[in-house]
């Protein structure tokens, strides 16, 4: 296994761990605006994983599982009549911290890569991870207009269900 293949595989395992954590968090965080942010982040992370899969396919390798990089799931969702947005602060803080740790771990190794295409791809992923970290930090601080402002002063009502499809 080449050094680049090893780095790409380990980086991908870390990304798999993050998306698994964010999917679990999205099932827990019922605040509509915060959950929309998770959906946006997960969508971008799926794109990142497709890029990594393409890079790994050059070596005949598939995306690895999170394995040792797996992150703990968030606590179970709070149920009740009205859940305050502050109830999700711990989950949002944790997700921001996990993204920050991922970027910190990989910044120097990625910058040392001599393969320009893979280095640039990984730097884009790290840059977007910093953006996602900022989203979660803002949400943890209680800022709900992360992806845009509501029009006409319409109040926030309702919550997101933890399961997409009910049968």
Which residue stretches match the model-derived regions?
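Iron-associated oxidoreductase/ferritin-like identity signal
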Residues: 1-167
């Amino acid at each position: 296994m080449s050094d680049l293949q090893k780095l790409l595989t380990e980086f991908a395992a870390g990304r798999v761990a993050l998306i698994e954590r964010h999917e679990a968090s999205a099932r827990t965080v019922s605040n509509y605006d915060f959950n929309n942010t998770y959906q946006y982040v997960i969508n971008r992370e799926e794109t990142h994983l497709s890029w990594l899969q393409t890079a790994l396919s050059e070596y005949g390798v598939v995306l690895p599982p999170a394995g040792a990089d797996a992150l703990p799931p968030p606590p179970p969702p709070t149920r009740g009549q009205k859940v305050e947005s502050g109830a999700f602060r711990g989950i949002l803080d944790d997700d921001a911290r996990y993204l920050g740790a991922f970027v910190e771990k990989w910044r120097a190794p990625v910058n040392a890569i001599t393969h320009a295409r893979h280095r640039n791809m990984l730097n884009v992923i790290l840059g977007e991870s910093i953006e996602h970290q900022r989203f979660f930090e803002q949400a943890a601080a209680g800022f709900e207009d992360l992806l845009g402002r509501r029009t006409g002063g319409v109040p926030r009502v309702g919550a997101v269900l933890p399961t997409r499809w009910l049968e």
